[in-house]
Design a protein with these regions (language model features):
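Hydrolases whose catalytic domains are alpha/beta-hydrolase-1, hotdog thioesterase
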Residues: 259-263
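Long, compositionally biased low-complexity segments enriched in polar/charged residues
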Residues: 10-12, 17-19, 156-161, 165, ...
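Active-site catalytic motif of lipid deacylating hydrolases and related acyltransferases
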Residues: 77-151, 155-247, 286-289, 294, ...
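Long, charge-dense tracts
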Residues: 11-112
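Gly/Ala-rich beta-loop-alpha elbow adjacent to hydrolase catalytic centers
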Residues: 252-256
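Extracellular, luminal, or virion-exposed ectodomains of exported proteins
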Residues: 1-21, 26-31, 37, 121-154, ...
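Short, flexible loop segments at boundaries between secondary-structure elements
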Residues: 273-297
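Short, surface-exposed basic-aromatic patches at helix termini and helix-loop junctions that form
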Residues: 192, 242-243, 264-274, 294-301
Length: 386
């Protein structure tokens, strides 16, 4: 029996898989599997998606008797010469540090795998995960923002810190084609637009990484007919927030709306309510009727779901919310400003939060897009939006 006088990092308890009929405690190689109390407490605090990642890695370790290809030491020294705790196995964005001998496998620690979190030189190498982002300046995007103000928005939100749970009052899910550095400031801008009076000084970003345009589009389709890994991960985060009684104000942009919609549907399928949670969706690629139905069923409060520029093809056409001939014509003429990378971001009808047609027209004129501004002015009276 373990002595309670030992620190939690050295107290061992049997490790059990939390589902009926599946135990890691002893396998055919005859080794018992233990975990330190400290590591077990860390494990219990993870959300369900993270736990499954850990148990999947543990299953592989146990099946190999602790001496498989997942063992770091096996590549550099014989088994008999292995030091006690040099074995590390990856479980998603987590690392497991474990020890092994002829009788036991011991999970010594679980923690973030710092080599796979954070910005990467190649955006497609980034992983989905949570980051706490802090405000660096008081610059906020409004109808009065000048071109100079807009240029400073990229510095308004600063360093991102990888975390394993949402502990801030606000959280966000970014859209497609965003690397982590872009997502951290852009979703801060959308957060301000959605919850202006809160004047948030920090928020948690659930980073939806980009794998390239084609793969991102495939992921959007996947969440409309099935469920992507990112949506499943977000569903576990929502459940974790609810379990810990944390009322979070969410904001989602573009593909983030599709992911959030599907995640809530997955939560609904489990019979779990999300009372206390709030969401605002900006320029979402999701079908609004489907999202509204899912949110109502979950008890989720919708703060805003209609912040869409009528010239933006993402919510109107890709989201299937307005397939009228006039909508198709409007979106067609402005599509190049959505997908083009050389245009100032304030000229895009999609990137920044939609504030008003007058604001959009002003930015088009200031940046020399006179033809587009005239087209928008012609449509303005018919649309009835100022």
């Amino acid at each position: 029996m373990q002595e309670r006088t030992l620190p939690p990092s050295h107290q061992l308890i049997p490790l059990e898989y939390p589902q009926t009929g599946w135990s890691l405690r002893r396998k055919r190689h005859g080794k018992q599997v233990f975990i330190t109390r400290e590591a077990n407490q860390f494990l219990l605090n993870l959300n369900d998606y993270q736990k499954n990642e850990v148990y999947r890695a543990l299953s592989k370790i146990v099946a190999e008797g602790g001496y498989g290809l997942t063992s770091g030491g096996l590549k550099t020294r014989p088994m008999a010469m292995r030091s006690k705790t040099d074995a590390i196995a990856a479980a998603g964005i987590l690392n497991l540090v474990y020890s092994v001998n002829s009788e036991k496998i011991v999970v010594n620690a679980i923690g973030l795998n710092k080599s796979v979190v954070g910005p990467m030189p190649v955006a497609s190498k980034e992983r989905a995960g949570l980051y706490e982002v802090t405000r660096e300046s008081n610059v906020r995007y409004s109808k009065q923002s000048s071109s100079a103000d807009i240029q400073t928005l990229t510095k308004a939100w600063g360093h991102q810190r990888p975390v394993l749970e949402v502990s801030t009052a606000h959280a966000a899910v970014n859209g497609m084609q965003n690397d982590l550095l872009k997502a951290r400031w852009l979703m801060g801008v959308h957060l301000d637009a959605a919850y202006w009076n809160d004047a948030a000084d920090k928020y948690t970003l659930f980073h939806n990484p980009t794998a390239g345009f084609v793969q991102d589009v495939f992921e959007c389709i996947q969440d409309k007919v099935g469920a992507s890994k990112v949506a499943k991960q977000l569903a576990a985060i929502l459940i974790d927030c609810q379990r810990k009684k944390r009322a979070i104000k969410w904001v989602c942009h573009s593909q983030g709306g599709i992911i959030f919609n599907r995640a809530v549907e997955l939560v609904n399928d489990m019979g779990i309510r999300l009372e206390g949670q709030k969401v605002a969706i900006h320029a979402g690629g999701n079908k609004k009727e489907r999202a509204t139905e899912a949110f109502e069923r979950a008890g989720l409060e919708v703060v805003d779901i209609d912040r869409d520029n009528p010239f933006d093809f993402v919510p109107n056409l890709a989201g299937g919310n307005n397939w009228s001939w006039s909508s198709i014509r409007r979106c067609y003429h402005f599509a190049k400003l959505v997908v083009g990378k050389q245009n100032p971001m304030q000229t895009s009808p999609h990137t920044l939060p939609f504030l008003s047609l007058e604001t959009s027209i002003r930015h088009l004129q200031l940046n020399g897009y006179d033809d587009e501004a005239k087209r928008m002015i012609r449509e303005q009276s018919r649309l009835g939006k100022c």
